């Protein structure tokens, strides 16, 4: 029995050694990633340089509940700093206790997004700011109301004068200040970022100390057999594209057809922007509707090829039905590989 255990341990050490050897090299020489991925996973870039006075005005605006119609909802109500500027409730709560129908995503690294919101309805941070301000179930206010708050609150008036000494209070410039503040919300380097940079600089001794054996195996599974990298790649661990994972609840109480609600293109039914996988440990629940609070459940859903609702039998044949993306295919994992993948996701 003892000799069998020693032999098994020797095989395991050899496997770990081989995997480390394949990754203790420059990233472009790492094992081939899944063929469907347009790019590999990448570290965060350096934070942008910002106007400090403008960002400070934006910070105060972000935390000011009186911008809302009822005076009790601020940007920070749904993007809480303590949880990675995300919302720990399944769906966000607006004025008068109204429930939204989507979970508020993290604002960390938000300046790196090409498209904003789950449905991609905005491409600019300063333009995006008007949407929650106006939305009747979020802040329920108007730009004019927001301008009045700056004029009436001493802290905001002072911050405005420092940021815009020669301008009258106006909403477009308030929105620019909010965008400037959000540009400062860069997440801290993760163990992956540290590993990548040391590997890139060929400092392999330090690279090896950045990840555990289990985390490295998880990264390998992520990039290869699990195919996570197909959609979750780049600096944000998101391809910034739109996919249907089958969680649209078509024809049911919580139906949400995603970007189709904007485009009215049948192929867009049920599609949502690929979420960032950075800061997962801080930002549960996950998915556009806050459906999951356990990463294992998400991993197992995808290992089965995603959710695949059936077309209702009574649905008129002339009507469209959202189809789960064919980029999602089932894959097999051992228990050890599943644990490793989860450990890697938790350090992002």
Predicted ranges, named:
Residues 1-9:
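Bacterial N-terminal signal peptides
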Residues 11-348:
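Periplasmic c-type cytochrome electron-transfer domains
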């Amino acid at each position: 029995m003892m000799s069998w255990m020693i032999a098994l341990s020797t095989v395991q050490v050899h496997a770990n050694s081989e995997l480390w050897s394949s990754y203790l090299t420059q990233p472009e020489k790492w094992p081939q990633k899944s063929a469907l991925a347009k790019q590999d996973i990448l570290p965060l870039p350096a934070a942008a340089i910002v106007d400090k006075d403008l960002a400070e005005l934006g910070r105060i605006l972000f935390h000011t509940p009186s911008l809302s119609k009822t005076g009790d909802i601020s940007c920070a109500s749904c993007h809480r700093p303590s949880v990675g500027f995300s919302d720990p409730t399944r769906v966000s709560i607006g004025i008068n206790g109204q429930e939204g129908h989507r979970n508020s995503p993290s604002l960390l690294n938000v300046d790196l997004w090409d498209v904003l919101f789950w449905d991609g309805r905005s491409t600019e941070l300063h333009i995006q700011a008007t949407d929650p301000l106006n939305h009747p179930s979020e802040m329920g206010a108007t730009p004019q109301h927001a301008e009045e708050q700056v004029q009436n609150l001493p802290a905001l008036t002072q911050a405005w004068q420092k940021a815009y000494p020669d301008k009258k209070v106006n909403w477009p410039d308030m929105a620019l200040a909010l965008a400037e503040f959000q540009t400062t919300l860069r997440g801290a380097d993760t163990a992956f970022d540290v590993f990548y940079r040391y590997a890139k600089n060929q400092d392999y001794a330090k690279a090896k100390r950045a990840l555990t054996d289990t985390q490295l195996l998880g990264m390998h599974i992520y990039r290869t057999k699990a195919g996570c990298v197909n959609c979750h790649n780049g600096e944000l661990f998101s391809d910034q594209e739109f996919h249907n994972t089958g969680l649209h609840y078509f024809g049911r109480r919580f139906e949400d057809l995603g970007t189709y609600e904007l485009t009215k293109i049948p192929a867009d039914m049920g599609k949502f922007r690929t979420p960032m996988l950075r800061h997962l440990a801080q930002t549960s629940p996950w998915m556009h509707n806050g459906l999951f609070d356990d990463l294992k459940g998400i991993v197992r859903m995808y290992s089965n090829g995603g959710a695949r609702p059936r077309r209702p039998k009574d649905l008129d044949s002339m009507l469209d039905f959202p189809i789960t993306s064919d980029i999602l295919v089932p894959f097999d994992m051992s228990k050890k590989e599943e644990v490793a993948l989860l450990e890697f996701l938790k350090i992002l």
